[in-house]
Amino acid sequence: MAVVTQVVRSEWTKIRSVASTVWTLSLAVVVTVAVGTLLSGLANSQFSRMPARERLSFDPTNISFAGMTLGQLAMIVFGVLVVSNEYSTGMIRVSLAAVPGRATFLFSKIAVAAALVLVVGMVTSFAAFFLGQAMLGSHRAHLGDPGVLRAVVGGGLYMTLIAVFSMGVAAMLRSPMLSLGILMPFFFLVSNILGNVDATKKIGRFLPDQAGSHIMQVVPRVGDDVPYGPWGGLGIMGLWVIAALAGGYVLLKRRDAQ
């Protein structure tokens, strides 16, 4: 137990001493909150001109999280750099020499980074919600309304899982450029295409971001017939995260440090 505590402290020192930690997490907060606030204000100004069908399905809570699409990209960068920086700098050899137990090394790093992201994600989610609702005026939702608190807490969990999934992928690929070169297009382009094209919707709905984002919905979308609820979607996302971490651990255990 003493060894694990020492490793956790070491990983915390590494993470907080790297400049990328500050700018990636700060960017995630600023972008998510700013875009959500802006689009909430726009929705309020355009609400009376919306078609009746759109007004009936309008989700004031979810519009606050419109910035998550961009904010999650910063979380992906953070997750990748937390793991891959040690490979790109060569520090992985020193780290594994100091901590021979590879499970202890990897999961201590993941635990520290995930705890930090969870705090940042929750702050971001609550800030985006309250500022977004302030911009919505009479169309706002309240934290005590049915499903709203679940959606706001879920927003923080969603950002955390995105970052941890990225850590698992980076542990498998080791290269920051390769990891980002796969994850960025996957979440920003491929997932959206698969989720919006009729022929591939049934596949796209089970991708991590598509499934996980349902936790932030309070009002169901028109025509949304997914076979899972908000927590079920987050559970699917959790399975993707577990698979990525398992793959990262297996490859770390089998490969030489380099």
Describe the residue ranges of each PLM region.
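Signature of the 12-TM Major Facilitator Superfamily
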Residues: 22-26, 94, 103, 107-108, ...
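Aromatic- and glycine-rich beta-strand/loop motifs that create alpha-glucan
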Residues: 1-30, 174
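Secretory targeting signals
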Residues: 20-80, 106-172, 188-194, 198, ...
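Helix-loop-helix units of permease transmembrane domains in multi-pass membrane transporters
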Residues: 81-115
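Generic structural signal for small/hydrophobic residues in well-ordered secondary structure
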Residues: 11, 99-101, 169, 175, ...
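Juxtamembrane transmembrane-helix termini
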Residues: 41-48, 85-88, 201, 250-257
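Junction motif at the cytosolic side of a transmembrane helix
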Residues: 236-258
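A residue-level signal for alpha-helical anchor/packing sites in multi-pass solute transporters
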Residues: 82, 91-93, 130, 168, ...
